[in-house]
Swiss-Prot record:
The lineage of its organism: Bacteria, Pseudomonadati, Pseudomonadota, Gammaproteobacteria, Enterobacterales. This is Inosine-5'-monophosphate dehydrogenase. The gene is guaB. It comes from Escherichia coli (strain K12). Transmembrane segments: none annotated. GO terms for molecular function: ATP binding; C-rich single-stranded DNA binding; guanosine tetraphosphate binding; identical protein binding; IMP dehydrogenase activity; metal ion binding; single-stranded DNA binding. It comes from the Bacteria.
Length: 488
């Protein structure tokens, strides 16, 4: 007898039922819990894939209210540096600003500027006492780069200094009065504590919805493998200030993965850890018991994933999410739906099935901010996109995600493909369209918050004819819509 557990459904098998509503789409609250302690302003995460998320995309997504996960197909030092780039991009108060000594040469300062991408450095003594600041304006026309900083720096008498905790309005007024772009935070002994820049104030005003930590820095996540030898990578990422760690595997309900989570939790009791991927209630429970702060669901739904075809294993995504959510009821541990999201309606369906947020790859892979070059093919612009189970990605370092250790291409068994997606422009436009669709869903279903959508919205199951009727039919599309693309 066939051991068939049950029937399982995915996004195209269901629709949400409209309900009486007092909710206007533009008043819907899209904020949600990523973990018990991290709140997002939109329920969107970017996948930890080498053609999707590095610092540039993570910054752009955090500014829109979501969070990006830096992929691990790079050296430990580089991944930690990518995390630092995000954390320092928009800092509020930079608590550990890079400083120079009065004896530092201008040539060394120039090298620092080229490496870091910014030109203002507080000048401190060996005892961390503030004596001045050197900026790009101070040295713009200097030709002798062997001179020490002390010759050209702005001395401390002319600096704008503030005490810790000073009101934003006071700081801005002082900066405006002296016509400067940087204010230095000092204690009573004039020791440097931090630095505030006008640019950070401007960025905060431009992006009020940004996802930030308590210190006003953008939030960022990073992925690590579950295999042995990843301890050093975890330590480096924690030291770099990562907000949430993703212990990433194609099969999270595996003893090796669970053990890695237990060990990481024991070493870092307060670190936010996401574990995955699973597709069953038992898998979700196992991750929660191992110490996960959130559980990621999805075995094989992604556009570039061939796991279900190569292995014959997987659970359609709506059922997988609903089962995981039911298993974690009462624990306060959120579920993340990872993969298979093609339209904003799929985001709404995943959340209505119980997910607190969705992780997307192909949706963001063709954006300006994603890694990789724009390619021209038959007159259209594309960007490359590949699964972390593809031969190319596995030979670069992601093979441990699929429990394979031999990096010779002819010995690897891929569970993903390499392809291309249409170039989509800037990430913020994609987010605007996707979140706009989600807001419209919340208006139609009468759900004012993500939590209400998770718990109140009802589904109907539809037939093949129902999905055919739902899509564009009996017409030729002459102008592409920004939120509806079939194929690529």
């Amino acid at each position: 007898m066939l051991r068939i557990a049950k029937e399982a459904l995915t996004f195209d098998d269901v629709l949400l039922v409209p309900a009486h509503s007092t909710v206007l789409p533009n008043t819907a609250d899209l904020s949600t819990q990523l973990t018990k302690t991290i709140r997002l302003n939109i329920p969107m995460l970017s996948a930890a894939m080498d053609t999707v998320t590095e610092a540039r995309l993570a910054i752009a997504l955090a500014q829109e209210g979501g969070i990006g996960f830096i992929h691990k197909n790079m050296s430990i030092e580089r991944q930690a540096e990518e995390v630092r780039r995000v954390k320092k991009h928009e800092s509020g108060v930079v608590t550990d600003p890079q400083t120079v000594l009065p004896t530092t040469t201008l040539r060394e300062v120039k090298e620092l500027t080229e490496r870091n991408g910014f030109a203002g450095y507080p000048v401190v003594t060996e005892e961390n006492e503030l004596v001045g600041i050197i900026t790009g304006r101070d040295v713009r026309f200097v030709t002798d780069l062997n001179q020490p900083v002390s010759v050209y720096m702005t001395p401390k008498e002319r600096l704008v200094t503030v005490r810790e905790g000073e009101a934003r309005e006071v700081v801005l007024a002082k900066m405006h009065e002296k016509r400067v772009e940087k204010a230095l935070v000092v204690d009573d002994e004039f020791h440097l504590i931090g630095m505030i820049t006008v640019k950070d104030f401007q960025k905060a005003e431009r992006k009020p919805n940004a996802c930030k930590d308590e210190q006003g820095r953008l939030r960022v996540g990073a992925a690590v493998g579950a295999g042995a030898g990843n301890e050093e990578r975890v330590d480096a990422l924690v030291a770099a200030g990562v907000d949430v760690l993703l212990i990433d595997s194609s099969h999270g309900h595996s003893e090796g993965v669970l053990q890695r989570i237990r060990e990481t939790r024991a070493k870092y009791p307060d670190l936010q850890i996401i574990g995955g991927n699973v597709a069953t209630a038992a898998g979700a429970r196992a991750l929660a018991e191992a110490g996960c702060s959130a559980v990621k669901v999805g075995i094989g739904p992604g556009s570039i994933c061939t796991t279900r075809i190569v292995t014959g294993v997987g659970v359609p995504q709506i059922t997988a999410v609903a089962d995981a959510v039911e298993a974690l009821e009462g624990t306060g541990i959120p579920v993340i739906a990872d993969g298979g999201i093609r339209f904003s309606g799929d985001i709404a369906k995943a959340i209505a099935a119980g997910a607190s947020a969705v992780m997307v790859g192909s949706m963001l892979a063709g954006t300006e901010e994603s890694p990789g070059e724009i390619e021209l093919y038959q007159g259209r612009s594309y960007k490359s996109y590949r699964g972390m189970g593809s031969l190319g990605a596995m030979s670069k370092g992601s093979s441990d995600r699929y429990f394979q250790s031999d990096n010779a291409a002819d010995k690897l068994v891929p569970e993903g493909i390499e392809g291309r997606v249409a170039y989509k422009g800037r990430l913020k436009e994609i987010i605007h369209q996707q979140m706009g669709g989600l807001r419209s869903c919340m208006g139609l279903t009468g759900c004012g918050t993500i939590d209400e959508l998770r718990t109140k919205a009802e589904f109907v199951r539809i037939s093949g004819a129902g999905i055919q009727e739902s899509h564009v039919h009996d017409v030729t599309i002459t102008k592409e819509s920004p939120n509806y693309r079939l194929g690529s």
